[in-house]
Amino acid sequence: MQWASVLLLAGLCSLSQGQYDEDSHWWIQYLRNQQSTYYDPYDPYPYEPSEPYPYGVEEGPAYAYGAPPPPEPRDCPQECDCPPNFPTAMYCDNRNLKYLPFVPSRMKYVYFQNNQISAIQEGVFDNATGLLWVALHGNQITSDKVGRKVFSKLRHLERLYLDHNNLTRMPGPLPRSLRELHLDHNQISRVPNNALEGLENLTALYLHHNEIQEVGSSMRGLRSLILLDLSYNHLRRVPDGLPSALEQLYLEHNNVYTVPDSYFRGSPKLLYVRLSHNSLTNNGLATNTFNSSSLLELDLSYNQLQKIPPVNTNLENLYLQGNRINEFSISSFCTVVDVMNFSKLQVLRLDGNEIKRSAMPVDAPLCLRLANLIEI
């Protein structure tokens, strides 16, 4: 009997110790489960999401102890998802929607991409004027079915995605708060001078893959613009008055045949310029057109140039392949060639021209001493 009491007491101690060990690690299981359901509110929009819903990708209980996660609020449209752990986002993408559903007032991020929406009716966002991001790309929206003031009331809107639609005109008016505007892959033919009026906070403008023939002076007031993409259009002239803050300019695959003298002087921060696949000739370029000290990369490939245009010694990458260049002028890179004066050029592409490697002048290695790739 005495031994039985001892064994019973030992068993109880062992059971108590085992329960204590399990409970002492409950917080680890809690953190693991919390991490599995975590969703980053500042990365709510992968442009090409690999999963239809980036939240809740791991299955399993959300909590090791306590109540389950709260259900979706009742104000969420039945066609959409409103994750409880990110209450200001509404996901209505890839649902074959033909209309825009009601948007609750608490929403900051709404995603309607990849549907069959053809209209943005007036007042559809009046209940949610605090929206920051609106994604409407990959739909069938036409300009005549976009309410004129549908976006102007969104005074906090920062990003607007209207690319890959059927727009033929610039939307507007747009709110001053806008920072990114995506209008690429539409059928827009022109940008009126007042189309972007008041967008002083805009930093990136995507208008590539449209049918734009002219933009006039519509870019003049965009004092914060850093990136301008007008590639794959029908432009014959470069935009008038580039913004002073501009760093990246993409104009490839147009019909541009001339660039004015000192055109880039008003943009002292400009780093990258792409003008490939245009109709540029030496007659359409002034002597100092590309002599900008800020430029790091210049792409003039696949034009109709016969001579290498003069560039600044600070330029690092120059692409001239696919032209009609028939001579190698070292003065295009170095006005004076000596030990102290040389070009910072690292990449020079001259292949696909009418020039041979033997045409390189003897002082080329001294001028282009930093080059690690010269293709002829």
Swiss-Prot record:
Tissues expressed in: Highest levels observed in knee epiphysis, in calvarial and diaphyseal bone, in nasal and costal cartilage, in the eye, and in bladder. In mature knee joint it is mostly present in the proliferating zone of growth plate. It is also observed in ligaments, especially at insertion sites, in the junction between meniscus and joint capsule, in the perimysium of skeletal muscle and in the periosteum.
Main location: secreted
This protein's encoding gene: Fmod
Glycosylation sites: 127, 166, 201, 291, 341
Function: Affects the rate of fibrils formation. May have a primary role in collagen fibrillogenesis.
Residue stretches of each LRR repeat: 106-127, 130-151, 156-176, 177-198, 201-222, 224-245, 246-266, 269-289, 294-315, 316-335, 344-367
Family designation: Belongs to the small leucine-rich proteoglycan (SLRP) family. SLRP class II subfamily.
Domain of life where this protein originates: Eukaryota
InterPro entries named among the record's database cross-references: Leu-rich_rpt, Leu-rich_rpt_typical-subtyp, LRR_dom_sf, LRRNT, SLRP
Statement: the UniProt record of this protein carries the keyword rRNA-binding: no
Record note on modification: Binds keratan sulfate chains. Sulfated on tyrosine residue(s).
Species of origin: Mus musculus
One GO location term (cellular component): extracellular region
Keyword Repeat among UniProt keywords: yes
Location of Sulfotyrosine modifications: 20, 38, 53, 55, 63, 65
Domain named LRRNT: residues: 67-105
Pfam family for this entry, one: LRRNT
Subunit structure, as described in the record: Binds to type I and type II collagen.
Modified residues (Pyrrolidone carboxylic acid): 19
The protein, known as: Fibromodulin
Keywords assigned by UniProt, alphabetized: Disulfide bond, Extracellular matrix, Glycoprotein, Leucine-rich repeat, Proteoglycan, Pyrrolidone carboxylic acid, Repeat, Secreted, Signal, Sulfation
